[in-house]
C-alpha cells in the first residue's frame, strides 16, 4: 500500500511537470520582448547608435553536458545555438515533451530533451535579458536530405523559434556539409528561396543571420563563371581590383579559391531580408599574412552598408594553425580599430565572433579572446 501511494505520487508529479512545460511552451517562451527585455531589433539599434561592435559566439548544444548557458562570458551580445536541422520534422511540441529523447533526433539540438534546453535557455534569459539568442541551422552537421524537405520544414522552424524563445535564425551555408559547391547556382537559388520563406513565416521582430565563407564577398577570378554567380563588377573587390599589381598575394589566393564569391549572389538577391552575416574565416588556412583579414572584412562591409547588415568577423578557437588567431592581441586590435572607425562613421555595429564557445578542445583561450574583442571594439 505504501509503495502504491509513493508510486502514485511520483506519477502525479511527473504529469504536473510535463503539463507545466507544455503550458509554458504553448503560451510561448516567457522571455518575450516587452517589460522584461527589449525587442532584438531595438537591441541591435542601440549598438548602431553607440557605434559599439557586437561580440558573438556559437554555442554548440553538445557542450551543454559540461557547461551552462548562464555562465557564458558577460560581454557576449549574440549567441548562435548550434545546430538544428534545416529539414527538421516533428508532429507537435507536445510530442517532444512527451518523449524527450526525440528532441535530438527530430530537432537536431543535442540536449537530452526539451526540458533541459528550456531550463538552460531560461537561466540565460534571467541572467542576461539583453542577450540575443539565435537558432543556427545546417552547417557541416546537418545539410538537408532534399531541397523540398527543407522548404517544407520552414513553417515548423518558424513556430519552433517562437515557442522556444529564440530571437531569430542563423543559416549556415555549407550545402555539401562543407565549403564545396558554394557557387552552384541551383544550390544558391535554393538557399535564397529558403531564407526568403523563413522571412515570410517569422515574426517581424525576429532576426535572420547567414554564415558565409571568409572569401565569400571577393569576386572569383580562379575560374570562368558565365552566370556571374560569384562576381560583382560594382563591388570594390571585383575582377579589376585583382588585376592591380599591388594586390596582396594572399588576398589574390583567396579570390582564386573555389569558395570565392560564394556570398555575392545570395546577398544581392536576399538584400535587406537578412540582418546579420557571420564570416567564417576558418576556411582560410595555410597563410602567413593575417593582415588580409582587413580586406576580407571590407569586402563584406560594402554589402553591409548597401543592405544594412551587421557584419561579424569570425575567429576560431579550434585550430592552432589559423592565421587569424583570436589570442593575437595586435591582430585583433589592428582589425578592431578599422572596424570601430567604420562603425563610428556609419552608425554601424559590426563586430567579432567565435567558433566555438565553451569547447573543451579549444586551442585558444576563449576568455582572453573576448577580452581583446571588447578592448578593440569598444
Swiss-Prot record:
Native organism: Plasmodium falciparum (isolate 3D7)
Disulfide bond as UniProt keyword: yes
Similarity comment text for this entry: Belongs to the glycosyl hydrolase 18 family.
Domain of life (superkingdom): Eukaryota
Active-site residues (renumbered): 174 (proton donor)
Signal sequence, renumbered to the chain: 1-28
Effect seen on changing residue 203 to S: Increases catalytic activity and chitin binding. Loss of catalytic activity and chitin binding
Gene3D superfamilies per the UniProt record, alphabetical: Glycosidases
Protein name, as recorded: Chitinase
Gene Ontology biological process: chitin catabolic process; polysaccharide catabolic process
Amino acid at each position: 500500500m505504501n509503495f502504491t501511494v509513493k508510486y502514485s505520487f511520483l506519477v502525479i508529479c511527473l504529469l504536473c511537470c510535463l503539463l507545466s512545460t507544455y503550458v509554458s511552451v504553448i503560451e510561448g517562451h516567457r522571455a518575450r520582448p516587452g517589460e522584461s527585455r527589449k525587442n532584438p531589433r531595438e537591441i541591435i539599434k542601440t549598438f548602431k547608435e553607440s557605434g559599439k561592435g557586437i561580440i558573438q559566439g556559437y554555442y554548440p548544444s553538445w557542450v551543454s553536458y559540461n557547461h551552462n548557458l548562464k555562465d557564458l562570458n558577460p560581454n557576449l551580445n549574440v549567441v548562435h545555438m548550434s545546430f538544428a536541422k534545416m529539414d527538421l520534422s516533428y508532429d507537435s511540441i507536445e510530442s517532444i515533451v512527451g518523449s524527450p529523447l526525440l528532441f535530438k533526433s527530430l530537432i537536431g539540438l543535442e540536449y537530452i530533451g526539451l526540458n533541459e534546453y528550456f531550463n538552460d535557455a531560461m537561466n540565460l534569459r534571467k541572467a542576461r535579458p539583453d542577450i540575443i539568442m539565435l537558432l543556427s541551422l545546417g552547417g557541416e552537421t546537418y545539410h538537408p536530405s532534399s531541397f523540398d524537405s527543407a522548404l517544407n520544414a520552414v513553417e515548423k522552424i518558424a513556430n519552433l523559434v517562437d515557442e522556444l524563445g529564440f530571437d531569430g535564425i542563423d543559416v549556415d551555408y555549407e550545402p555539401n556539409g562543407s565549403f564545396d559547391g558554394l557557387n552552384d547556382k541551383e544550390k544558391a537559388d535554393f538557399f535564397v528561396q529558403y531564407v526568403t520563406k523563413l522571412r515570410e513565416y517569422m515574426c517581424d521582430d525576429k532576426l535572420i543571420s547567414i554564415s558565409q565563407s571568409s572569401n565569400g564577398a571577393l569576386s572569383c577570378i580562379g575560374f570562368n563563371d558565365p552566370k556571374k554567380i560569384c562576381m560583382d563588377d560594382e563591388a570594390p573587390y571585383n575582377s579589376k581590383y585583382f588585376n592591380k599589381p599591388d594586390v596582396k598575394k594572399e588576398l589574390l589566393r583567396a579570390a582564386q579559391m573555389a569558395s570565392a564569391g560564394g556570398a555575392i549572389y545570395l546577398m544581392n538577391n536576399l538584400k535587406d531580408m537578412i540582418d546579420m552575416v557571420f564570416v567564417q574565416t576558418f576556411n582560410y588556412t595555410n597563410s602567413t599574412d593575417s593582415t588580409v583579414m582587413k580586406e576580407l572584412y571590407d569586402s563584406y562591409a560594402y554589402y553591409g552598408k548597401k543592405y544594412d547588415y551587421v557584419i561579424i568577423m569570425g575567429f576560431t578557437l579550434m585550430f592552432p594553425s589559423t592565421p587569424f588567431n583570436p589570442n593575437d592581441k595586435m591582430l585583433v586590435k589592428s582589425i578592431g580599430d578599422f572596424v570601430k572607425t567604420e562603425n563610428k562613421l556609419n552608425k554601424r555595429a559590426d563586430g567579432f565572433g567565435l567558433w566555438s564557445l565553451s569547447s573543451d578542445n579549444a586551442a585558444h583561450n576563449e576568455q582572453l579572446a573576448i577580452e581583446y574583442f571588447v578592448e578593440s571594439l569598444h
